[in-house]
Amino acid sequence: MSEKNTIQFNFSYYALNLLGKQMYTNRWSAISELVANGLDAGATNVKLYINSINKKKSILEIIDNGSGMSYNDLATKYALIGRNKRLSENELSDKIKGRKGIGKLATLFLSKKYYIVSKKAGVTTAWMLDSTDKNDNDVPELI
């Protein structure tokens, strides 16, 4: 075989939901993980807004002043499940609170649909993951 082909792994909604649900014992531990992600991004200010007046459509917003994510950051860092932030030379490895690179899955413990709004270098971008009507075998996409 003279030609070398590579195959990248994909994760189905089932796998991501399973990981998200199995990692946390309650919603507060999942929220704590998401706050830690902001702190890992250098945030010095993190605010939580919770609107649970309508229990079926509760809203949780976590707003921080961390470094933010560009489209490239989202594609190469956020979407990579299990990324070790400590190996990146551009990040403050001694202050990193995350341990396994899968804390972003805490969102799936909390909801089947979530939004990411981020600002980096003056550019605001937004993405959404919605697994509400997806089959277990579908591959997730942030849109």
Language-model region placement:
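GHKL (Bergerat-fold) ATPase N-terminal catalytic module, capturing the glycine-rich phosphate-binding loop
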Residues: M1-I143
